[in-house]
Structures are given as structure tokens and as C-alpha cells.
A protein has these predicted regions:
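C-terminal beta-signal and adjacent terminal beta-strands/loops
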Residues: 4, 729, 738-743, 766-828
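Gram-negative outer-membrane beta-barrel transporters
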Residues: 514, 616-630, 650-746, 825
Length: 828
């Protein structure tokens, strides 16, 4: 444990000599009448921090050192935006709002966001916090320093296919919404952020909720929620460009612009981006393009906004990973892979020369090609002084394929007859196929918000959504050495899936006493799912399933005074199996069942900005959260993958994730700051049934009733960021991440695991204001500064091998050794 904890203590010691930040408070009032405005929303760097009191007052206990953006919004008034400089001394800022404005983007997402009144655990990240880390890597790497988060990359350097786990739960258990619209694929529940490259450059805030959290649209949260907002309204014209280059020939170029307010009522914003990389893994290249465009109309208490964004990705397939002997150099072990047909002779030879950067494929166009176009129409409408409505219509169009060279494949696997040549019969051929997805996802969401001006004791939301997903799955043969009866473009399998999902929820917070707040939330969700047709192995995957879930939540907050708060909540989350749980069920495993999560969260928050033990106005912000996530029929990863790299899963009757999350943030004026998180957890299956296979691939139950660790669930995760400003405009940061051992399957076998690892990054940013532009920023990110050699993901499987003994085959995803990204950013 000390290897994870002591580095944080050491960083605290470095920060201790100069530890301070200051509070900001004031009163918000009507510019015409001077009357206070209770319930006005206060946002700092895009993150909602609370609302004004019945007297119109607000207080931010501790504003970190450095420049910030303070934003104040209220239904029926123009939003107010002003710069704010964090400093050790207390500041008072009284502001007056002009009538006629509208609660802008916040009204559209407030229905799914948590606050300090919802008794849940969450982390808010504003545009500035995201921008510090945004060098072109995918979103999981920008969230890697948040509590309980673990990021990994198939290609090794954060570009292309990436993965995020929170509390050991992968992307299929993390509900992701953009402006309240579901992003998770309805069939797989995954959020494939590779399809939206450089999305971070258009995000103005993210809220990361851990546990079940508040009710969300889309698939249920089984470990966390990512609530993303791109709804920033900038009233002044702007333009900026970000350009990065670094290791593995990695490039990022983007241009962003905004017109500001045009003709009193209209705004237009846009972005064009391109990210490209050769990847750390050999041939694991990425070519990613995206755009973002928003057109807004606001007048009085009405905001109408159309948003479209799109991404197109072409990535060389790296989802097979690297065989263990390629990393260890163990030739005897490599021979086992060769003897059992896991590797060809050529692949085994390359494993010895390429090592940990080995790639399974050599066919030049072994690529994944996909485009995803999003269209959203949002309405925010003030309904008198106490009510507001946020509503959205959405359409997502996705289509693409991955292309593969297949050696020595049977004609029968493609539903083709054998080829007769004279007296010979050919049963196999080399060929190239493409597996396609072609889909539409469409629907609507709404949130009716009640926040009385005269009394902020009660806040309530009634919301919901209806969504439909239509998805075609099919394969095409585009070339064959021996064509049989096929022709270019011939389909060899086809199935059509339909999924309908609708939900409704009601949520309220009530300040029963000055020190006691109550929270309640209830959601009803119904799903209908149907598949018709055959899959690539020519098996019939016809499926019919429907589910209805009731998910209640309740909690309470207790104010202890002096910046202290206790909170506790209990929430139920339920969700349906994903597509592969139906179509790829392994022999020996029962049909997949729906999962249930009972989530208990309890914690303590402490925030003071008026202490003096480290100097005047010393500020301290600490929190401790206990979680007990108890599952019934949890679907856990078996450690195996299907042929497109998707993890295979099985139900386990009883399991749990329990632990504590400790977080802290301290700062000293504008000179030095430290954020630190530590998660200690125990993740167990109480009655695991281990299935292996004999030489004929018949299932054999190896063990039953075992108490084992849940796969991919580290017991210790920590993250620490020490940042300082030794000179004006120059900011240096050290980022340290530790992750303990993770097991690749549920047998808790150390020979099927990922070793613990520790990674140190260095970030340097230098901002200039030369006069001919608003800002010129030079930045460098050195990742894995100490050149650690580690793998952050992997998979495993076992069977009775050619030797007659059980053989285990481990595959890993090595992460890049020391590498860098340098950027030049210009703001006009």
C-alpha cells in the first residue's frame, strides 16, 4: 500500500509551505429594481456550484488560484459572464442581472446533473481544467486523474481506441450523455469516443458521477456517469487554433470560431479537427477527423439551439493485443502458442523481433472505418419565474465497417460451396471481408424544472425520454483467391436489430431544516429488443427480449457548519444484457439475465478558506466517500474476447464492490496547488463458477462456489497532480498515477493478471500575451517520464492444449514508454 500512498504524502509535503486560496461571495440582484434574485445559478469555469439563497446571496468557499470565468444565470434574465482571478484574500462581488435573458445551456442539462443537495458523489470539470490536459489524446486520458478512474489505449499512446474504467466498471457500465442525449450504443452499451475525435475541444463542462448517481437518459449507470455539456453560449466573437505534434508522428490540428451575438439574438460556433498518429504499437495508426457546429437563437426566456457534430475514424486494428511471450521473450512459451495454432510461424517470428510493440496483423488495410453524425435540437424555455423546460430532439447516424484479410478459411463459413478443380476439391480459400454496421438512433428527451424564486427550499425535476435504435449488421466478401459462387460485395450474413427504450423520472430536493436536506429520485425504464437474422458464423441470432425496471433513489445531507457536510444515499440501478450476451454466449454458460445494483454511498465533505495554519486565508477542501455496490446477477467479463475485440461476459449471482474514495485539493495563491485522490476497494464474487474446455471445446466446470476477485478491478487506485507557477504565465505540473494488480479473469490467478504500475507525467504550459493576438500558449506534455514498461489492459483464455495439459494464453495491451506531445495554441 505504501507505494500508492506515500507519493501523495510526499507531494503534500512539497505543497505545504505555501497552501492558500480565497473565498468569493456577494449578492445577485435585479438591475432594474435592485431586488435580490434567489435561486440564480452560479457557475465557475462551466461547472455549476450552487444557487443563490432566498436573500440573493452566494458564497464560493475556496476559489483556486489563477484566472477563472464566473457565470451567473437566471430564468428571464441575461446571463452574466465576468473574469475572476483567484487570490488568497476574500473577495466580494455583487452583480446585477439585466432582465430579458434566458437560463442558457444549464436548463438543458440540469435534469441529469447532481449537486451538493443530491447526496451523491461527483466531480465537476470545467473547460479550463479539461484544456490543461488536452493535447489530442482521447477523453479517458483527460479524466485519468479523477477518483477511481483507469484509462488505457489499444494503440498504446491515447489516440485511437481507448478505454475508461471507473471503480473497475468498463464503458458498458458508464452512462454517457452529451447535452442530456444518450451517447452509449444501445446494443453494446459502449461509448466509442474514437468516433468523436477532439470532442474535448468543444466541451465546456463534464460531471463525472460515481455509483448509480442521478437518473439518466439511455443505458443505466452501473459504475459511473459522464454528463457532458457543449452548450456554452459565448456572447463575444472569438477564434483560436490548437496544433500539437509528438511521438509516434502524432498530430493534432484544429480551428475553432464563434461569432458572438449577431443581430441581438443569434450565435454561431464551429470547430474543425484532425488527429493522426502512427501509434506506439506497430502499424496501429489512426486517422481521425471531426467537426462541430452550433447555431443558437435566444430572445427573452427562450433559447433554441441546433447542434451537429461528426467524427470519422480510420484505425488500424490493434484490438488483438500482444501475446505474453512477445513481451517476456520466453521462447518456450512462444512455442506453446505456435503449437496450439494461436500464432502462425510468421507471427511467432515477428514476436521475437517486434517485442512489446508487436501487432497481430500485416495486411495493409486491416482497418476499422466508421463515421458517426449527430444532430441535436434543443429548446430551453422559461415558464414564468419559477419554472423552466429543457427539451431535445436528436438523431445519430452511424455507418462503417472493418476490413480483414482471412487466410485459409472454409467456404462453408461463408455459406459457399466447395470449388472442384478437375479431380481436386478445394474446401478453403484466402479472402478479404468487411463487416458492416449501418444504424440510426433517434428520439427525444425533456426535463421540466421547478425552482421557486421566493423559496429555494424545494427544487424538483420531472423528465424522461423516448429513443429508438435500428441497426443493420452484415458482412461482405470483397475479394477471394478462389471465388466459388461469390461475387465482389456479396453478403454472407445479415441481421437486423431494433431496440426501443423509454424512461420517465421525477427528482426533488427539499431543505427540511437549515441543516438537513432531503433528496428523492425515482425512474421507470422500459426496453424492447429484437434481432432477426444470422450472424457471421452462420448461426441464427433471432432474439426477443423486453424489460421493465423501477429504479428508486433517496438520500440526505447534513450541514455541520464551518464548511462541513455529511451525506448519504441509497440507489437502485437495473439494466438489460447487451447484444453479445445474447449472440456470443459461450458453451456451458446459462442465458444472460438482467443485472441489479444496490448502491449505498455515504461521505463527508470539508471546505474552508479562512484557516491560518499555513498563513492568512489558508484553504482546505477534503472529502471521504464510502461506497457499497452490491450486485445481483452482475455480468462480469470472463477475460475472453469475440472476433471484433468485444469482451465476453457471464452472470454471477452475488458480488460486490466496496471501498473508500479519499480526495483533497489545496492551493497557495497563484503559485502552487495539489490535488490528490486515493481509492481503496474490495471487489469480490461470492459464488463464481469457473468453466474451461476440453480438446473438443466441450465445457468442463473446473470449480464452483469460489470466492474470487472481480476481473479488471484494482484494489488500489491513486492520482496526484502537483502544479506550480514559478514565473508569470509559466505553469509546471507533475501528474502521478498508480494502479494495483488487476486480474484478467475471475479465477484470481496471478498468472492471468496485469501487474501493478506507477506512471509519472510532466506538463509545462507557458502563456504569452504579445499584443497582436489575445494569447499565445506553448505547451509540452511528457507522458511516462520515468519510462515505465507496463500494460494497462489485456485478456486471457484457457483450454486443453496440444500437449494434453491445460494451457493458458494471455494477451496484453502494452502502453507507450516515455513519449511527448508539444502544442502551440493561439487565441484571437
Amino acid at each position: 500500500l505504501k507505494k500508492y500512498f506515500l507519493p501523495g504524502v510526499a507531494l503534500l509535503a512539497l505543497a505545504a509551505p505555501a497552501w492558500a486560496q480565497g473565498p468569493v461571495s456577494g449578492t445577485i440582484s435585479d438591475a432594474r429594481t435592485g431586488e435580490p434574485l434567489p435561486g440564480a445559478t452560479i457557475l465557475l469555469d462551466g461547472a455549476a456550484l450552487g444557487a443563490t439563497s432566498p436573500a440573493g446571496t452566494y458564497s464560493l468557499a475556496s476559489v483556486p488560484a489563477g484566472p477563472h470565468e464566473l457565470r451567473i444565470t437566471f430564468v428571464g434574465y441575461e446571463p452574466l459572464v465576468r473574469p475572476l482571478q483567484g487570490q488568497p484574500q476574500a473577495q466580494r462581488l455583487d452583480e446585477r442581472l439585466q432582465p430579458g435573458g434566458v437560463l442558457t445551456g444549464e436548463a438543458l442539462i440540469v435534469g441529469t446533473r447532481a449537486s451538493d443537495r443530491t447526496a451523491t458523489v461527483y466531480t465537476d470539470l470545467g473547460k479550463q481544467a479539461l484544456g490543461k490536459r488536452n493535447f489530442g489524446q482521447d477523453l479517458p486520458y483527460l479524466l485519468d486523474q479523477t477518483p477511481s478512474a483507469v484509462a488505457s489505449s489499444d494503440a498504446g499512446a491515447g489516440v485511437g481506441y481507448t478505454n475508461l474504467r471507473i471503480r473497475g466498471v468498463d464503458g458498458t457500465g458508464i452512462n454517457t450523455t452529451i447535452n442530456g442525449v444518450p451517447l452509449n450504443d444501445p446494443e453494446s452499451h459502449g461509448s466509442f469516443l474514437v468516433n468523436l475525435p477532439d470532442l474535448a475541444s468543444s466541451i465546456n463542462s463534464i460531471q463525472v458521477q460515481r455509483g448509480v448517481g442521478t437518473s439518466q437518459n439511455g443505458s443505466a449507470a452501473f459504475g459511473a456517469s459522464l454528463n457532458i455539456s457543449t452548450l456554452e453560449n459565448r456572447r463575444e466573437a472569438y477564434a483560436e487554433t490548437q496544433n500539437s505534434y509528438g511521438s509516434f508522428n502524432t498530430w493534432k490540428n484544429n480551428v475553432s470560431f464563434g461569432t458572438g451575438l449577431v443581430g441581438k439574438y443569434f450565435t454561431f460556433d464551429g470547430r474543425l479537427s484532425r488527429i493522426a498518429s502512427d501509434g506506439y504499437m506497430n502499424r496501429a495508426s489512426s486517422d481521425l477527423k471531426s467537426y462541430y457546429f452550433a447555431a443558437g437563437y435566444q430572445r427573452g426566456s427562450t433559447l433554441l439551439k441546433f447542434i451537429t457534430f461528426s467524427g470519422r475514424e480510420k484505425t488500424y486494428q490493434a484490438w488483438n493485443g500482444v501475446p505474453e511471450p512477445a513481451i517476456t521473450g520466453n521462447q518456450a512459451q512462444l512455442q506453446v502458442y505456435l503449437d496450439n495454432g494461436e500464432l502462425t510461424a510468421d507471427q511467432a517470428a515477428r514476436a521475437l523481433t517486434e517485442g512489446r510493440r508487436w501487432s497481430y496483423y500485416t495486411y495493409p488495410n486491416q482497418t476499422d472505418n466508421y463515421q458517426q453524425n449527430h444532430y441535436q435540437l434543443h429548446l430551453s424555455q422559461g415558464l414564468g419565474s419559477d419554472w423552466s423546460l429543457g427539451a431535445a430532439l436528436h438523431l445519430t447516424r452511424g455507418f462503417g465497417y472493418y476490413e480483414s484479410y482471412r487466410a485459409n478459411r472454409r467456404f462453408s463459413a461463408y455459406n459457399l460451396p466447395d470449388v472442384v478443380v478437375g479431380a481436386d476439391t478445394l474446401t478453403r480459400t484466402n479472402l478479404i471481408d468487411r463487416k458492416w454496421l449501418d444504424n440510426y438512433f433517434y428520439g427525444g428527451t425533456f426535463a421540466l424544472n421547478y425552482q421557486p424564486r421566493a423559496n429555494d427550499k424545494l427544487q424538483a425535476t420531472l423528465g424522461g425520454g423516448w429513443n429508438k435504435f435500428d441497426n443493420e449488421h452484415y458482412g461482405e466478401i470483397i475479394w477471394a483467391q478462389y471465388a466459388s459462387t461469390s461475387f465482389p460485395g456479396q453478403r454472407y450474413y445479415y441481421n437486423l436489430a431494433h431496440k426501443t427504450d423509454y424512461n420517465a423520472y421525477a427528482r426533488a430536493t427539499y431543505q427540511a431544516l437549515p441543516w438537513l436536506g432531503l433528496y428523492a429520485d425515482a425512474q421507470v425504464r422500459h426496453i424492447r429488443y429484437a434481432i432477426d437474422g444470422v450472424e457471421d458464423a452462420q448461426q441464427d441470432v433471432t432474439t426477443r427480449a423486453s424489460y421493465t425496471f423501477f429504479n428508486p433513489k433517496a438520500g440526505a445531507t447534513i450541514s455541520l457548519g464551518h464548511g462541513q457536510q455529511l451525506y448519504g444515499s441509497f440507489a437502485v440501478g437495473q439494466r438489460e444484457p447487451v447484444r453479445t450476451d445474447f449472440t456470443d454466449r459461450q458453451p456451458g454458460y446459462a442465458p444472460a439475465r438482467a443485472e441489479r445494483l444496490n448502491d449505498l454511498e455515504a461521505g463527508y465533505r470539508y471546505s474552508r478558506a479562512d484557516l491560518a495554519f499555513l498563513g492568512p486565508s489558508t484553504a482546505v477542501r477534503l472529502s471521504a466517500n464510502y461506497f457499497d455496490m452490491t450486485y445481483v446477477n452482475q455480468l462480469v467479463n470472463t477475460g475472453q474476447l469475440n472476433d471484433v475485440g468485444t469482451a465476453l461476459r457471464t452472470n454471477v449471482a452475488n458480488s460486490y464492490r466496496r471501498g473508500v474514495e479519499l480526495t483533497g485539493y489545496v492551493a497557495a495563491a497563484d503559485k502552487i496547488s495539489l490535488s490528490s485522490t486515493l481509492t481503496l476497494s474490495r471487489n469480490r464474487i461470492l459464488d463464481y463458477r469457473d468453466v474451461t474446455y476440453d480438446a473438443s471445446y466441450n465445457p468442463v466446470v473446473a470449480a464452483e462456489g469460489r470466492n474470487t476477485a472481480i476481473s479488471y478491478s484494482p484494489s488500489v487506485v491513486s492520482a496526484h497532480t502537483l502544479e506550480g507557477q514559478p514565473l508569470g504565465g509559466l505553469r509546471l505540473a507533475l501528474l502521478y498515477k498508480t494502479v494495483s494488480r488487476q486480474y484478467l479473469d475471475n479465477t484470481e490467478n496471478v498468472n492471468r493478471s496485469l501487474a501493478d504500475y506507477q506512471v509519472l507525467d510532466l506538463r509545462v504550459r507557458y502563456a504569452l500575451h504579445p499584443g497582436f493576438v489575445k494569447e499565445l500558449e506553448l505547451a509540452v506534455l511528457v507522458s511516462n517520464l520515468l519510462n515505465a514498461r507496463y500494460s494497462a489492459n489485456g485478456y486471457t483464455y484457457s483450454y486443453l492444449g496440444a500437449s494434453g495439459n491445460s494451457e493458458t494464453f494471455n494477451w496484453y495491451y502494452p502502453q507507450a514508454t516515455r513519449n511527448f506531445l508539444a502544442s502551440v495554441n493561439v487565441r484571437f
